[in-house]
UniProtKB/Swiss-Prot annotation:
One of its GO terms (molecular function) is protein serine/threonine kinase activity. The keyword Kinase applies. It is an enzyme of class 2 (transferase). The keyword Transferase applies. GO terms for biological process: asexual sporulation; negative regulation of sporulation resulting in formation of a cellular spore; sporulation resulting in formation of a cellular spore. Keywords: ATP-binding, Kinase, Nucleotide-binding, Serine/threonine-protein kinase, Sporulation, Transferase. It catalyses: L-seryl-[protein] + ATP = O-phospho-L-seryl-[protein] + ADP + H(+); L-threonyl-[protein] + ATP = O-phospho-L-threonyl-[protein] + ADP + H(+). InterPro entries: Anti-sigma-factor_SerPK, Anti-sigma_F, HATPase_C_sf. The lineage of its organism: Bacteria, Bacillati, Bacillota, Bacilli, Bacillales. This is Anti-sigma F factor. SMART domains: HATPase_c. PANTHER family: ANTI-SIGMA-F FACTOR RSBW, ANTI-SIGMA-F FACTOR RSBW-RELATED. Belongs to the anti-sigma-factor family.
Amino acid sequence: MKNKMQLQFTARSRNESFARVRVAAFVAQLDPTLDELTGNQTVVSEAVTNAIIHGYEENPDGMVYVSAAICDDGTVEITVRDEGKGIADIEEARQPSFTTKPELERAGMGFTIMENFMDDVEIQSQQESGTIIRLKKHLALKNALCN
């Protein structure tokens, strides 16, 4: 049985911190280490920021959907979805330093950062239909807080 949560919000940069904090609060029930918690916050920030900046090109009318689940074995699954313009070439986009917006700070590092913090990163995208990023990380269970 999975414990689940869902969020949806408009594609505004200020909502990135909202998503990050909500997912961190949800994952906190596993009593993660500070590194694990920070890693989860970082990947949510990167995925949501990608949806806002690249998916919707900062059009605040778009919606971003975030869900998180905690599996019985302690695996955390996070999904970030948008209905934006999609990614033309996923393999190219996953290359370190590849960017379509070189003028931005840290441009091109989003997927690399996600891959460094998570056990599994899956990206599905269709042009003009949006992108789904699925992130998985196994956290060690601490029995006192999981029951």
